[in-house]
Structure formats: C-alpha cells, structure tokens
C-alpha cells in the first residue's frame, strides 16, 4: 500500500474510521496505488529482461498444454494456512495425479516436503525479496539486518533460521530446478532471472495485465508493444496469477486452491502481517484498526482478518471467477476467499473426488 493523491487526506492525525472501515473506502484506489508503487519498476524490469527472452519461451507455448493427463490441478500458495494444513502431505499420501502449480513463495515448502511442482509462477518485481524464494546466493547477515520482511511473516517455520533456510533452498533448487517449468513475469527482477537461469528451470515469459490496455498511457499496452508477449490478468498477486495459469493458460476444468488465505489468523500481531510497515506509514500505529477487516468464514466456523491489499485481492478474485469456465474449489480450509463461483470444501474431499 502507498499513499496516492486520491487518499492523502488520510493520515495519522485525522483518521476517524474504525474496525476496517478505511480498508473498504480504499478499495477503489488500490489499482492506482499499485500502479504508483510498481509501475516504473515493472517497465524497467521488462525492458532489461528483453535480453533474456531468448532464454525461454512465450507463455503461449504453454497454452492448453497438459502437464499431466488429468484436467484438474492444485494451486499451492504460501498463505499462513500452509504450515497448518500441510497440503503437500495429502497430495503425496493420495498419489494425486493432477498438475501441481505453486507460487514461487510456496516452492521451497513443496520441495522440502518431497513434492516437485509441475509449474511455478512468479510476479512480484521487488529487487531483493523475491529471489529469497529461489535461494539468494548473496544473502548475508547485513542483508537480513537491512530488511526484516521475512522475519516478521507468519510463515513456514523452516524460515526461522534465515541463513540456513536460504542455503537449503539453494541446494534444493539446484537439484530440482531443471525438472520445473516457470511462468516468469517480464516484471521480474534481475536477481530472480539470474537465479532461474542458474537452476535450469524452463522459462515461459508473460506480461502481467496491470491496467486496461485500451486506455491512454496504459502500462500493459507499453509492455505488450515492448515484447509482444501474452498478457495475463494476475489479480494483483501471485496466488491469483497461479490460478489464472491453471484456468486461462492450461485450460483446467477443476482447480483446487490451497494456501490462498488472503488473510491472517486471529491472534496474529499486526507486526507479523505483510503490509504492516505500509499501514503504519499510511495511518500511524494508533489507527491500525481502521485498516484491518474481520471476516467470519462460515465454512470453517472461524474468523480471520485482512488488510486493504488482501481485501482488494479477494474482491478482484471474486470478480474474475465469474468469467471462468473452470470449477474452483477453495481447499485452503480457512481465510476469507469464499463466495459465489467458489466451492469451499476440505482438501481431502477434493482429493477423494479427483485423486489418484
């Protein structure tokens, strides 16, 4: 999240909203805020990556491909439910024979649990953080001291010792990278591109759809003019992008979501939420309750809370699923992604229906 001209009136001295009311008011501004935050970086990275396009394929070559014979797939994202529900164990126990699509942030979880995903998806253009999911060859204590992003997250306990975890990821991906296809966004940082090439992952390039390409000054149109690659509506986040790869690119008919929480478990300190520092910058610590929304999930009988970014991702996903020809099953068993067009069932129920 980043303050834009449209929301500058909100600051730590005059916030009157409570109980997440401000988050709902910000929904209409989130697309512009995202463009302000990442737009220049997306274009800079895409221009630099022109020199690497010949190291991979266009995403169009993956379209309607069957990575596995089955017409169903499981998406594994890295929401806080991942370490609680452990979908990899269920996949292996049930000898699931469908396609496994993992966000880059869930890739190390998969490999650590003996599961090699068929396709990995990456989107975020951040210069230094995203490469951590691939193993950062340059990570040291100085880098860790400069950015506590990973240390603050409610994530896989394996990341508690960050240096050791990084070395483990380096080793695992060096071993398994050549077996994995990756849908690599042109917005990706040079650190990620270098690491992907080093590991031998098979690259399929794509452009994220960042705005309406028919509008004047469209970033999406600039990307497409620059490289001619397919554009995919990623919904603002890698979890939704992974679902779109299953739906619009691979043409799957049944898609299970795991680790797609778009939220946090009750009791999680605000400090451990992904956009905590951005929230502090926007409204100040005393007004954080104005930005965090509570949801009761009727399918699991528990409540969860979310921030403006993940609230936006949720609303965008619910719009996108209406246009999908696939049947989407949320098997996260928690979180806030539920509504029309999504069947909320346990992951075991999905595996019983579509397992090996």
Q: Which positions does each model-derived feature cover?
A:
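Active-site phosphate/oxyanion-binding loops
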Residues: 263, 267-301
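Contiguous, well-ordered alpha-helical segments that form the cores/surfaces of helical PPI scaffolds
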Residues: 104-112, 240-245
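Glycine-rich phosphate/pyrophosphate-binding loops
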Residues: 106-107, 113-127, 249-271
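N-terminal donor/sugar-recognition subdomains of glycan-related enzymes
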Residues: 1-97, 108-121, 128-205, 229, ...
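General structural concept
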Residues: 98-104
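ATP/pyrophosphate-binding catalytic subdomain of soluble kinases
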Residues: 219-260, 264
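Active-site gating loop/helix substructures
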Residues: 200-234, 285-302
């Amino acid at each position: 999240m980043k303050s834009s001209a449209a929301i500058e009136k909100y600051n730590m001295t005059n916030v009157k909203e409570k109980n997440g009311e401000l988050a709902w008011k910000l929904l209409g501004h989130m697309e512009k805020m995202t463009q302000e935050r990442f737009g220049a970086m997306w274009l800079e990275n895409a221009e630099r990556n022109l020199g690497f396009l010949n190291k991979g394929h266009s995403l169009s070559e993956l379209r309607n491909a069957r990575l596995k014979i089955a017409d169903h797939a499981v998406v594994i994202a890295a929401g806080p439910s991942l370490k609680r529900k452990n979908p990899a164990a269920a996949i292996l126990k049930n000898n699931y024979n469908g396609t496994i699509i993992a966000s880059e942030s869930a890739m190390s979880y998969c490999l650590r649990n003996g599961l090699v995903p068929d396709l990995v998806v990456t989107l975020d253009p951040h210069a230094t953080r995203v490469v951590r999911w691939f193993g950062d060859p340059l990570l040291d204590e100085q880098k860790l001291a400069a950015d506590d992003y990973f240390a603050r997250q409610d994530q896989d306990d394996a990341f508690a010792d960050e240096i050791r975890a990084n070395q483990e990821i380096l080793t695992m991906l060096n071993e398994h990278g050549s077996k994995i296809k990756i849908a690599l966004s042109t917005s990706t940082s040079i650190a990620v591109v270098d690491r992907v090439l080093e590991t031998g992952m098979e690259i399929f390039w794509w452009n994220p759809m960042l705005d309406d390409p028919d509008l004047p000054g469209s970033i999406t149109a600039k990307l497409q003019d620059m490289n001619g690659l397919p554009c995919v509506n990623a919904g603002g986040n890698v979890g939704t992008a992974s679902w779109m790869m299953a739906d619009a690119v691979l043409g799957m008919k049944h898609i299970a979501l795991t680790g797609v929480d778009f939220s946090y478990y009750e009791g999680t300190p605000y400090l451990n939420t992904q956009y905590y520092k951005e929230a502090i910058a926007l409204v100040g610590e005393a007004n954080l309750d104005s930005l965090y929304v509570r949801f009761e999930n009727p399918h699991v009988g528990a409540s969860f809370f979310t921030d403006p970014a993940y609230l936006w991702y949720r609303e965008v996903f619910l719009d996108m699923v209406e246009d999908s020809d696939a049947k989407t099953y949320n098997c996260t068993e928690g979180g806030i992604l539920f509504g029309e067009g999504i069947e909320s069932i346990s992951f075991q129920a999905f595996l019983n229906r579509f397992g090996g």
